[in-house]
């Protein structure tokens, strides 16, 4: 699979997962094993392995404000540590369009050594503006419709740029969805039904590789989407079930213990439905006993400094940060719809073999 000038041995992208689920260990090992490892740029101020020379200003154990939550120095150290594992193999960063300081974080990732930038959670109409000084960095938006791809390609004409690849994410993915709540369950929005129009649209703009995401689990799924005309797939949740995944062991236990009915869609301060495991947090929100929303990190623009968080009953930065630390009581545990299928922890090497050779 080729993205921009980068050749990836296997047609598998490990999806970005934040806070702290896909950092140096997971992304580094996926790239080492021939996939594309993706470092999440969200919440880097929480990184547990910071060197003493990086100073993160904390308030109540949480990174204070945007500069600390999206720490440039921490992101650089995460990339450096991943490079110790995968050397010069392609490595990507996932940066949500909805974050505060999007442009700055894109530049930070380029400076840190990202070869590819992947962006979802919004339509990144001005993404190329922030990579002008990094012409070798490949740009990959995530879309949920042909219409969104068309809009991006039109807007990018002013930069004389088309996407180096496009990821089409269906409504079975973990975390935020590009669909209204009720549309997540409709036949017409299933990944296999939205992918073909995107492939057709991509042909109108040149040879843009199309990558399928959302509910991909095994080699059978990968083969199916490649037969539909995709260049590859992006999958995230299954990589949580690896030793190398940067998540706390207690985070992995939440998925190991989850049943199919525990994985649900929920409201999010970002204003989109989000999929995760129903844990104590959801019950405490219903009972009004969840941790108080204080907006310490100011993480995402749509939340409007905690306004939306107060409406839905939780702060997404704080709760994802808690999950990264292994706090099962107050953490938010995002998962794709297949997360309950994780039944044991294996190595990235073994998982990549299952995905490429079958199991």
Predicted regions and their residues:
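Short, surface-exposed recognition loops or helix-turn segments adjacent to catalytic cores
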Residues: 127, 212-213
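Conserved active-site-proximal phosphate/metal-binding subdomains
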Residues: 13, 173-211, 217-359
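Residue-level detector of alpha-helix initiation sites
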Residues: 21, 216-217
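Active-site entrance/lid segments in N-terminal catalytic domains of soluble metabolic enzymes
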Residues: 1-205
